[in-house]
Amino acid sequence: MQKQNWLITGVSTGLGRAFAEAALTAGHTVVGTVRSEEDLRAFEELRPGNAHGRLLDVTDDDAVPGVVAEVEQSVGPLDVVVANAGYGLEGTFEETPLAEVRRQFEVNVFGAVATLRAALPHMRRRRRGHLMAVTSMGGLMAVPGMSAYCGSKFALEGILEALGKEVAQFGIHVTAIEPGSFAPTGPDGP
């Protein structure tokens, strides 16, 4: 396999960290986004020279395009972008405050959209690339007590399906990653 440049959001723990470790092990260069200096240093220590950390809050609409453009300049053309940053919100529909529902969509939907949109023009110009986003089995079937989370993942599924049809003509692939349950890493898991 040819060495590729990857950008993965949310690599501090969990799936993002696992994706990054797998790509690094395969010999790829990975730029991983985190929200703290401590997590940035820990990520870069995984594979010095191939693991590059960037501070980014995916809900900062102004910051996302700048980070993607900077990575394209400093690391090289991005071959794969994985919009992974997200979280699960538990709570019944009736009892979950609207502000928490909005935040769930800001991170899980609009953060992913901002990330993929920022990378798309670069890939379209090169007529190649792979855009991925982590949805969930919760984006395919509803789970009681997680209406906001499932709603955000259903929304992302629809966006990705349409996006795939829009960009296929440019040689760009789109993948929805739909994991089921997994054991978290970091402070909340093994």
Q: Positions of the model-derived regions?
A:
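The beta1-alpha1 cofactor-binding region of Rossmann-like NAD(H)/NADP(H)-dependent oxidoreductases
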Residues: 56-66, 98
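Conserved glycine-rich cofactor-binding loop
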Residues: 12-13
